Amino acid sequence: MDMAQYQPGQRWISDSEAELGLGTILAQDGRLLTVLYPATGDTRQYALRNAPLTRVRFAPGDEVTHFEGWKMTVREVEESEGLLVYHGLTAQNEQCTLPETQLSNFIQFRLASDRLFAGQIDPLPWFSLRYHTLERRSQLLQSSLWGLGGARAQPIAHQLHIAREVADRMAPRVLLADEVGLGKTIEAGLIIHRQLLSGRAGRVLILVPENLQHQWLVEMRRRFNLQVALFDKERFAESDASNPFEDTQLALVALEWLKEDERAQDALFAAGWDLLVVDEAHHLVWHQDQVSAEYALVEQLAEIIPGVLLLTATPEQLGQDSHFARLRLLDPNRFHDLEAFRRESEQYRPVAEAVQELLDHGSLSAGARKAIHGFLGSEGDELLASVEGGDEEARSRLVRELLDRHGTGRVLFRNTRAAVQGFPQRELHAYPLPMPSQYEELPAGEHPDLYPEVNFQQQWEDGDDNNRWWRFDPRVEWLIDTLKMLKQFKVLVICAHAETALDLEDALRLRSGISATVFHEGMSILERDRAAAYFADEEFGAQVLICSEIGSEGRNFQFAHHLVLFDLPAHPDLLEQRIGRLDRIGQRHTIQLHVPHLENSAQQRLFQWYHQALNAFLNTCPTGNALQHEFGPRLLPLLDGGEDKAWDALLAEGRARREALEAELHSGRDRLLELNSGGAGEGEALVEAIEEQDDDFALPIYMERLFDAYGIHSEDHSENALILKPSEKMLDAGFPLGDDEGVTITYDRAQALAREDMQFLTWEHPMVQGGMDLVLSGSMGNTSVALIKNKALKPGTVLLELLFVSEAVAPRALQLGRWLPPQALRCLLDANGNDLAGRVSLETLNDQLESVPRVSANKFVQAQRDVLAKQFDVAEGKIVPRHEERVARAKQQFAAAMDEELARLTALKAVNPSVRDSELDSLRTQREEGLALLDKASLRLEAIRILVAG
């Protein structure tokens, strides 16, 4: 096409994305062509010289459709200033004119028949690959696991329940407040991933404290294959774009930088986001008479971004005022009065007790009956009567109804270790060691005893190895001896500083020959991946991984259960973060904590504080942050000295205060909230479904077909792992292999969790989805001719196999794929026009087929062209009733689902103000638009296979 012939208003179709419907040329600007696809609302820009577009030009005899729905048969085509005008007759035989600008956006084309008659006949395996790709894509879009089963994480019930519950809402606004170690970041990642896959969100902004940026980057990339753009002062300043944020689907920004840079704030406000995620939201300070700059900034963003996820510490840790401040960000109209919020919270206590009695399966107390009646009225009385009659389904429904009406149950999710099973025990091993004379001679400074080696690292940076600190520090000798005793186990060593980690690696290598690898913030993500993989390798890997404080963020090593704390961090939250590298749900062994410390030093006193006052080694310490604030000013001076009597008194006071706070937390536990957050059994069903999907061989079988078709060479790497490399016959350089040199993959979840250097292939992985997109967006496989060897068929008999796709073209956010996913409808015509597809499967046919040389195949097609064209129409006549039946069923199911959810939320709003009006309005709009687009669902000829008996 001559570039000058592109004109605004012309209609073109994408060769690679036919599902977008008819495109309209918007503009030709320099070397770029802009095309709008009104059916889906998408806009694409193409390089002018090689735009993958085909001009839509109907011929006399073709039937065309106006965007209002009426049809006409073309009699004449006129061209005026580059635009086509069609003249013809309506169904009522009335003359009419239809400019191409007014064509329906939903028209589809028989590209398969065009290619067949043009002699473009594909290799035999491609037809099957296209069919299986269509079938699998259809199943995936309907799957309840879509967006939940592909994460590199152990499937955990409460996480999956929260992710599905939140991600399936339009513009969710919720608070994730699980206790430490329960995986809030994974929950957020699952929600982001599912929202992106479903189309409910297109652009996501993640705000985090600066020290957590790397953790988020690693978690999103490693666990969810989400490519997040990390923005900081330098990247923002270096960008040539008028708004650097606008070209980014997923942006990660540090709150500390953002609050200081007004230009960045303005750009962020103008960029247009669908979902805002804020980590460590409890650090946003709010009081009734004053708010912090960080809180005000997040508040502004929350006002203009439809969806908001706040990740925060548990409400009990924060206190009710601070907790109210987070809820106020989510819905300022609902949470506007702190005192009213306090009163409302008290009302739910008797309901929680009633739910607990229901779950205990005992007889209900009078108080429980009263609470249920007060909360649910006559509906509750009916369910209660059924429960007493032994109806277990009624019991489950009654629990669900009570949970649904819980005041903050729709906006707040909080799981506790007490409510979630599966955590390991911890054992503590303390090793007091003598203070070396070299450290005793150090000048007084800011707690030099905590990290005394730092002074020697600075002093002897380029000095004699014999004088290095690790030659005389008794902790190093102890470490070598301990590692030798534990030589059959993997051991994780964590210390505060990167320099210390590097020194320890030197010490182990030079003094003992123990194989160790390091992990610190100065390494690239790729270098850390390699170090983690070397540590994880059971056969040839390192026994020891030495991590710095920051370097270990975001990494979990559950395959190890021995943790050496070479020194102690100055904050209890950091201590919990260290232990959390091993102490996760799914850890199969008791965590062995090894803590060396120097006697009569700050190290020893900090150990005593954490152990005796906070009990932070043997249990998680939800009160640690509060106790640090309360006791910090008195604790720090006593670490370096002070009388033993004063120290013992502080330990006793700290222990008493911790026990009092823990008692308050326990009595204040919101059991109703815990039950709602845990999912009351729904999460367990999702876990079972994911495990069943993991055990299915469908994905490896499909991927082998895909690799063969595209010329990707696969070879064994080790058990459950393959190496993929592009071969000399690689068909498409655009295949999403991820690395031109090759990649190592595994389909095994356990292997993927232990080996982060391997790609974990699931149906959601970009390589799998990208490969499927390549198949369906291209034309390969939509024409094929084969010889069928079957004694029951007379030689020369022709069978015609056609694949039609029944689909609704719609914006992804409407989720119509759940009710009417694109589905291949197969027709197998014999010479008499009978459809044999119901009796003869595609796989049965495949076993009887042989390839035909392309030249011979083309000669046959051209000779039979007129006969084949008529049979296409016969086949379409057979398929249309099936398509119409699918559409009718989809409309019925879609309307029923929407009506049920509208009724539920409307009833809920009467008793639970946390249901927003915007949610109801959005659902009503979604219902109307969805039904209208289902009415326009189309049928297109996707692929043709001609079978000649021989």
Swiss-Prot record:
InterPro entries: Helicase_ATP-bd, Helicase_C-like, Helicase_RapA, P-loop_NTPase, RapA_C, SNF2-like_sf, SNF2/RAD54-like_C, SNF2_N
All residue ranges annotated as the Helicase ATP-binding domain in the record: 165-333
Keywords, ordered alphabetically: Activator, ATP-binding, DNA-binding, Helicase, Hydrolase, Nucleotide-binding, Transcription, Transcription regulation
Gene name of this polypeptide: rapA
Gene Ontology molecular-function annotations: ATP binding; DNA binding; helicase activity; hydrolase activity, acting on acid anhydrides
Domain annotation Helicase C-terminal: ranges: 475-629
Chain positions recorded as ATP binding sites: D178, E179, V180, G181, L182, G183, K184, T185
Lineage, top ranks: Bacteria, Pseudomonadati, Pseudomonadota, Gammaproteobacteria, Pseudomonadales
PANTHER family in the cross-refs: DNA ANNEALING HELICASE AND ENDONUCLEASE ZRANB3 FAMILY MEMBER, SWI_SNF-RELATED MATRIX-ASSOCIATED ACTIN-DEPENDENT REGULATOR OF CHROMATIN SUBFAMILY A-LIKE PROTEIN 1
Organism: Pseudomonas aeruginosa (strain LESB58)
Biological process, per Gene Ontology: regulation of DNA-templated transcription
Pfam family, one: Tudor_RapA
Residue span of motif DEAH box: 279-282
Enzyme's top EC category: hydrolase
Source taxon at top rank: Bacteria
Entry similarity comment: Belongs to the SNF2/RAD54 helicase family. RapA subfamily.
Full protein name: RNA polymerase-associated protein RapA
NCBIfam families in alphabetical order: PRK04914.1
Entry's EC annotation: 3.6.4.-
Annotated signal peptide: none
UniProt function note: Transcription regulator that activates transcription by stimulating RNA polymerase (RNAP) recycling in case of stress conditions such as supercoiled DNA or high salt concentrations. Probably acts by releasing the RNAP, when it is trapped or immobilized on tightly supercoiled DNA. Does not activate transcription on linear DNA. Probably not involved in DNA repair.
SMART domains assigned to the protein according to its UniProt record, in alphabetical order: DEXDc, HELICc
Oligomer status and interactors: Interacts with the RNAP. Has a higher affinity for the core RNAP than for the holoenzyme. Its ATPase activity is stimulated by binding to RNAP.
